[in-house]
């Protein structure tokens, strides 16, 4: 059991948990900043303002919400 503890200690020293990126750093988790960056679907070139959605072709390229 002490070998496992030594191995765990060595692994934590070589690869600390602070080196792992947090999920909060992802832009998808920050919708307010996404809207400020002007990357919302309403500004997508394939957004249909009449139907207020994107065509099925544009959905493959990141335009949401998709028309079904």
From Swiss-Prot:
<dbReference type="GO" id="GO:0005576">
    <property type="term" value="C:extracellular region"/>
</dbReference>
<feature type="disulfide bond">
    <location>
        <begin position="53"/>
        <end position="67"/>
    </location>
</feature>
<keyword id="KW-0379">Hydroxylation</keyword>
<feature type="disulfide bond">
    <location>
        <begin position="54"/>
        <end position="63"/>
    </location>
</feature>
<dbReference type="InterPro" id="IPR004214">
    <property type="entry name" value="Conotoxin"/>
</dbReference>
<feature type="region of interest" description="Disordered">
    <location>
        <begin position="22"/>
        <end position="46"/>
    </location>
</feature>
<feature type="modified residue" description="4-hydroxyproline">
    <location>
        <position position="65"/>
    </location>
</feature>
<feature type="signal peptide">
    <location>
        <begin position="1"/>
        <end position="19"/>
    </location>
</feature>
<feature type="disulfide bond">
    <location>
        <begin position="59"/>
        <end position="66"/>
    </location>
</feature>
<dbReference type="Pfam" id="PF02950">
    <property type="entry name" value="Conotoxin"/>
</dbReference>
<keyword id="KW-0800">Toxin</keyword>
<protein>
    <recommendedName>
        <fullName>Conotoxin Mr3.3</fullName>
    </recommendedName>
</protein>
<keyword id="KW-1015">Disulfide bond</keyword>
<keyword id="KW-0964">Secreted</keyword>
<feature type="compositionally biased region" description="Basic and acidic residues">
    <location>
        <begin position="27"/>
        <end position="46"/>
    </location>
</feature>
<feature type="propeptide">
    <location>
        <begin position="20"/>
        <end position="51"/>
    </location>
</feature>
<comment type="similarity">
    <text>Belongs to the conotoxin M superfamily.</text>
</comment>
<dbReference type="GO" id="GO:0090729">
    <property type="term" value="F:toxin activity"/>
</dbReference>
<keyword id="KW-0732">Signal</keyword>
<dbReference type="GO" id="GO:0008200">
    <property type="term" value="F:ion channel inhibitor activity"/>
</dbReference>
């Amino acid at each position: 059991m002490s070998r496992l503890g030594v191995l765990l200690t060595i692994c934590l020293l070589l690869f600390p948990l602070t080196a792992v990126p947090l999920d909060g750093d992802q832009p998808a988790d920050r919708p307010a900043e996404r809207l400020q960056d002007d990357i919302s679907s309403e500004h997508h070139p394939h957004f249909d303002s009449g139907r207020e959605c994107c065509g099925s072709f544009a959905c493959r390229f990141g335009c949401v919400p998709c028309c079904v």
